[in-house]
Structure formats: C-alpha cells, structure tokens
C-alpha cells in the first residue's frame, strides 16, 4: 500500500515538475523585469511619452473624465503627428483606441500611481508563458502513443518547457517591458491565450481573449482577424473563424476611419504621416500597393528593414521559418512596422514588435513538430531506425539549436541578466533629490495647472492639466530637470525659453536644486541657488577610466565613465560621463565636442556636449573643482573609437583651427590623438 502511494506521489511529482518549472521562470521574470521597470521609473528615465500621458488618462478615467489627458493641449512644439490640428487634442481616442485602459483604471483603486501600470505590464507579459507552454504541450502531446520508453516519456513532458524561455527572453518583449507603459504590450499574452483556446477546441475562450486583445490598440483587431482566418481555413471552423475575422477587422477599420477622426478632426489616423512615401491616404496607399508594388519591395530591401525582419526570426532561434503559415497571421503588424518612415518602429526597440512575438513562438512550436514528424516518417518508411525515436531526437536537436541561436541573439540584443546590455542601477542621488519637489507639487490642489519636463511628467501627472514643457499656457508652476531629456525641444531652446520666462513672463525661481528648477508665476526671484549646480560637481569621484590629459594649461580631463544602457535597438546604447577640472579661471565659454569613428577612420557621428554650453558654461567652473558632464544615451557602443575636443567659442565642430591645443599628458602615459592632434581619443581598456 505504501509502495503504491509512493509510486503515485512520484508520478504526480514527475508530471507537475514541468509546470512548476514554468511557474518558477514566470516568477523570475516578474521579479527581474518588475524591478528593472520600477527602477527605471525611480531614476527619472520614464517619460511623458508614453507613461506620463497614459497614467494621466487612466487617472482621469477613474475620476469621471474618460481618456482625457493634457500632454498635447496648446502644444508649443512639433511632433511627427499634427497635434496642432487636432480638434480635441486632450482626448486619447484621437491618437489610439485602447478601451482596455478603462478597465485598467479600476486598479488605481488599489494603488493610485504609474507603478501600477508598470507592474501590470510586467505580470501580463510574463503570464503569456503559460499559453506558450500549453500550446507546445498540446502540439507535442498529440504524438504520444502510449508506447514510449521512460526516457521518451520524460522528454515528452519537458520539451514544451523549452519554449518558455524562448518567449520570456525575446528582445521585443523585453523592449516593450522597459519602454514605459503601452496597452499593446498586454496583447501578446491575450493573443497566445486566444490561440491556445482555439487549438484545444474551446471557441468561447478564443472569442473572449480575442475580444479583450482588440481593446489593447486599434491595430490588434487585424491580428485577431488573421487568427479568425486561421480558424476558418486551417481549423475548418468556418462560421466561428469568419465571424471573428469580420468583426475584428471591422473594429480596426472603425477605430482608424471613424473613432480616431471623430476626436482628432483629421481624415484618418494621425500616424498615417509615417507612410506618406506610399500615399497621402489609405486609399492612395492601397492603390499604389496594387499598381506600384515595386515601391514597397524596394522599401523592404533597405538594410535597416532587412535587419529588423532578420532580428524577428532570430527571436525564435530561427525556428519560426519552419512554419511560415503561422507567420502570415503576424503580417499586419510586420507591415505596419516595416513600412513606417519612423525608424524606431522597425528597430526592434520600443513596444512596436510585442504583438508579433506570439506568432513567432507558435510558428517555432509548430515548425519543430512538423519537421520532426516529416523526418520521423521518412526514416520510418525506409526502416532505417524507429521512427518514434527519430521524432523525439530530432525535436531535441532542433529545440536545442533554436535555444542556442535565440540565447546568442538575446545576449546581443536583450536586456536581461543574460545580456550584455543588462544594467540594474541604484536609485541615484539626483532622483532622490527630486522627491521633495514631487511631494510639493502633489500637495497643490488638483485644479492648479502645471507644466513639466518629459522625464518628470509621470511623477506628477495626477491632475486635470499637466502641460508638457515648453507648453506653458495657464500653468502656475513649471518643473524641469535640466539634465534630463529636453525633448520635444533642444537643450539650447529649453534654456532660451526658461530665460525668456524669467525675463518677460513674470515667472520666478521658487526652488532650484541639483539640476531641478521649480518656477512660479508672479514670483520675484530670478537667481538659481548654489545647490542647483551640485548635479555638475563630482568632488571625490573615481572615473572608471583615468585619462590625465591637459589642454593648454586651462583644462584637465581626469577620466571618463562608459555605461551601457538597457535599450533594445540594433546598436549598443551607452552613456558617456567625463570628469573635468579647470586649472585656471576660464573667461570664455568653451565647448566640448565628441567624435565617433569606425575602424576605417570614417567619422560616423559628432555629438556636442550641450549642458556645458547652456546650463553650466565653463566660465562658471571654479579652478580645482571637478566637473561631471554626462551625454545622453547614444547608440554608439559598437563603434570602436570615440574622441573629445575642446572648441573655442563661435567655432564650427569641424574647424580644426578652432580646437584648443596642445593636448598633453599629465601622467607621463602616451595619449592617442586624432585629426592633427586636436582630438583626444577616449581609449577603453
């Protein structure tokens, strides 16, 4: 009796072990990416576009103002969409149709903040691993005959688990997870669940999850429509499939041609401008697709587009190519991304490719099963070896190969601890010193309008009117981080606007600390506090790489830091921080220019250091004081050479005569100098 009970217990444990492993992988993903996403927000690296405005729209929805936000209201800036021409620029439905945000707003009853959105996004993405596992188990389980050896039985149980890390480590999902919050990032799990229900003959689940998926974004209806066609033509569920296809495609068309124009006042989606190279209207684009297909084919031959398409396949370890029929279901999103003139959409970064991942995973599962079944049948027909053994051994080989390829691609392009891009930053002193300002703003009555810089917007968005600086309108307060991204304007324009506001618009400085500015309308105070410049001071700093290079006995470069940033894009993004010391008073406003070369000595990029010009010019540097200057993250990490030059005022970046010379070593170590010894190379060890 005890022996039988023990055998039963062992049998249950063996069968539950794969599912338990899937659960552990999901929990690990949630813990790691939840922390990464939260830490990114805590360090002021989330932005108005898109966490800030989504958070405000969700908060307003909960408070009886559905889908209202003020990010683009009275916009004093230009974007790649015509926000100035919107009839109702304060209604989100004019930009995207994402009804799921109304349901998400109820979660704010539990925790009222953008952290809710970030954790929700992480958890839902992770839960997509469950239908991946179930789809694989269903597909490979159909090959079980009951005559497998113990080894083959164990393999049957564990093979589906291999597709879970393939999903969780896909760079497009990780990119979406660490790109603020987007409702469309919730769609992969919903699409996978819908497909799982379809393939296991539970149409109610297919319809239910498909219905929720289409509420994530206007284009997701096209993906569900393609799944409906799969149900009709592959699964032979004609009525179910065609009804779902027509309803879902109809919803997408209604969203783009009716709902969005109703609120925007435009003829169609405002994002149609990103496809202007193919026509100025949906009808013109379709006409050109039929009459001038070469126009589209030429676009697909662009190196950046080919690289993007190849990266998608590598996400599945290349296994998705084994079952191209499934990949057809992803065609709408692939086309939307590939044909866009906005290169971020076909970079593999951001949230744009998240909804493609489900079909890559399904194609990988079906492709492995199909090829191994064909191989096993061919071998068995020729009586070479047991066909069933060939099936399982071929499956193992294919999955192992696919995982190796996917892991290699993930190491290069992902952002998990297994990637070269992984970074878990501590909460910085700069972010900590922003908290008193956030708390002060949050104590203001919610009807008081404010204007905020992009990276501070998500932290103070819970009020009816929060403008994105440089829009001021009727704002009573302006809150800026001058070291953060100045977009949608340049650093120089930002500084000019602040100066004009202080000089002519009756604003004064209410607080200034560590690079943060709080301006108040009607205040008679125009000086920055001494602590405002603390963000540029680095007393006692220890650069990663010591340099010791002097410029004409005026400036000393003590060293630099080279920090990789966790951004999914073809090129490695890095943040370069340099440490300088003025050796004597600097009367002129010197400029720092960074140059990036390839191995063939071709100049690839020129990047000016703008903070030192506009917010902390060199004539403010005290002799002997260490000054820290950080460039914004740049996609230059794979370039082998970077150099810096000190330019005299009012000289061009390429003007050799305008560069400060000579450059000499203060440590006795040789320096690597470029371009007539006017540029110092920052040599990494």
How would you name each of these model-derived features?
Residues 1-35, 137, 151, 157, ...:
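Start-transfer (signal-anchor) and selected internal transmembrane alpha helices
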Residues 18-30, 245-249, 372-414:
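Signature aromatic-anchored transmembrane alpha helix within multi-pass, membrane-resident enzymes
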Residues 32-36, 43-46, 233-331, 365, ...:
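Membrane-lumen/periplasm interface segments of specific transmembrane helices
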Residues 106, 114-141, 193:
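Transmembrane-helix motifs of polytopic, lipid-linked glycan transferases
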Residues 127-169, 188-189, 204-208:
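Transmembrane-helix signature of polytopic, membrane-embedded enzymes
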Residues 163, 192-197, 204-218, 223-232, ...:
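Membrane-interface alpha helices of multi-pass inner-membrane proteins
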Residues 327-383:
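Hydrophobic/aromatic-rich transmembrane helices and adjacent perimembrane loops
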Residues 402, 425-460, 464-685:
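C-terminal luminal/periplasmic domains and tails of membrane-associated envelope-modifying transferases
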């Amino acid at each position: 009796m005890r022996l039988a009970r023990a055998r039963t217990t062992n049998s249950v444990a063996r069968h539950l072990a794969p599912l338990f492993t899937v659960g552990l992988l999901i929990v690990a993903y949630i813990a790691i990416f939840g922390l990464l996403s939260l830490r990114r927000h805590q360090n002021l690296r989330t932005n108005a576009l898109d966490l800030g405005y989504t958070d405000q729209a969700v908060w307003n929805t909960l408070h009886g103002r559905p889908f209202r936000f003020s990010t683009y209201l009275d916009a004093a800036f230009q974007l790649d969409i015509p926000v100035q021409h919107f009839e109702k620029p304060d209604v989100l439905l004019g930009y995207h149709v994402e009804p799921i945000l109304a349901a998400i707003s109820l979660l704010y009853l539990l925790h009222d903040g953008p952290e809710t959105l970030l954790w929700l996004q992480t958890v839902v993405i992770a839960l997509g691993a469950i239908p991946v596992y179930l789809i694989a188990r269903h597909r490979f389980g159909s090959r079980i005959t009951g005559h497998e050896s113990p080894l083959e039985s164990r393999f049957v149980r564990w093979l589906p688990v291999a597709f879970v890390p393939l999903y969780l480590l896909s760079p497009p999902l990780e990119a979406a997870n660490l790109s603020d919050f987007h409702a469309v990032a919730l769609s992969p799990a919903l699409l996978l669940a819908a497909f799982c229900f379809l393939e296991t003959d539970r149409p109610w689940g297919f319809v239910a999850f498909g219905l929720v998926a289409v509420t994530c974004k206007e284009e997701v209806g096209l993906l569900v429509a393609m799944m409906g066609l799969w149900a009709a033509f592959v699964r032979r569920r004609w009525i179910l499939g065609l009804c779902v296809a027509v309803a879902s495609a109809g919803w997408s068309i209604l969203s783009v041609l009716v709902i969005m124009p109703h609120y925007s006042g435009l003829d169609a989606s405002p994002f149609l401008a990103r496809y202007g190279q193919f026509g100025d209207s949906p009808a013109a684009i379709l006409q050109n697709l039929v009459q001038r297909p070469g126009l589209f084919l030429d676009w697909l031959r662009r190196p950046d587009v080919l690289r993007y398409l190849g990266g998608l396949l590598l996400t599945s370890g290349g296994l998705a190519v084994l079952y191209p029929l499934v990949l057809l279901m992803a065609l709408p999103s692939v086309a939307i991304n590939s044909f866009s003139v906005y290169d971020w959409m076909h970079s593999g970064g951001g949230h744009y490719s998240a909804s493609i991942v489900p079909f890559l995973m399904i194609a990988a599962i079906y492709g492995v099963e199909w090829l191994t079944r064909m191989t096993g049948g061919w071998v068995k027909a020729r009586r070479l070896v047991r066909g069933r053994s060939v099936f399982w051994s071929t499956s193992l080989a294919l999955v192992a190969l696919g995982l190796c390829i996917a892991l290699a691609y993930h190491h290069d392009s992902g952002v998990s601890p297994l990637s070269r891009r992984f970074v878990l930053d501590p909460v910085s002193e700069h972010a900590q010193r922003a908290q008193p300002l956030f708390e002060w703003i949050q104590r203001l009555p919610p009807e008081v309008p404010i204007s905020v810089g992009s990276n501070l917007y998500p932290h103070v968005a819970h009020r009816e009117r929060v403008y994105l600086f440089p829009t001021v309108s009727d704002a009573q307060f302006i809150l800026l981080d001058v070291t953060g991204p100045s977009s949608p304007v340049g650093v120089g324009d930002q500084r000019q606007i602040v100066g004009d506001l202080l000089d002519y618009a009756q604003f004064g400085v209410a607080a200034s600390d560590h690079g943060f500015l709080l301006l108040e309308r009607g205040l008679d105070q125009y000086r920055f506090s001494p602590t405002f410049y603390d963000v540029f001071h680095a007393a006692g700093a220890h650069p990663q790489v010591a340099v010791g290079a002097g410029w004409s006995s005026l400036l000393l470069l003590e060293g630099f830091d080279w920090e990789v940033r966790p951004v999914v894009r073809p090129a490695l993004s890095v943040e370069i921080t340099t440490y300088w010391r003025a050796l004597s008073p600097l009367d002129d406003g010197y400029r720092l220019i960074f140059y990036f070369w390839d191995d063939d000595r071709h100049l690839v990029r020129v990047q000016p250091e703008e903070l030192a010009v506009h917010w902390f010019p060199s004539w403010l540097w005290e002799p002997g004081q260490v000054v820290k200057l950080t460039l914004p993250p740049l996609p230059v990490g794979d370039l082998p050479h970077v150099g810096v030059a000190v330019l005299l005022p009012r000289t061009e970046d390429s003007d050799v005569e305008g560069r400060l010379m000579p450059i000499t070593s203060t440590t006795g170590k040789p320096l690597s100098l470029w371009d007539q010894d006017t540029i110092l190379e920052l040599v990494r060890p």
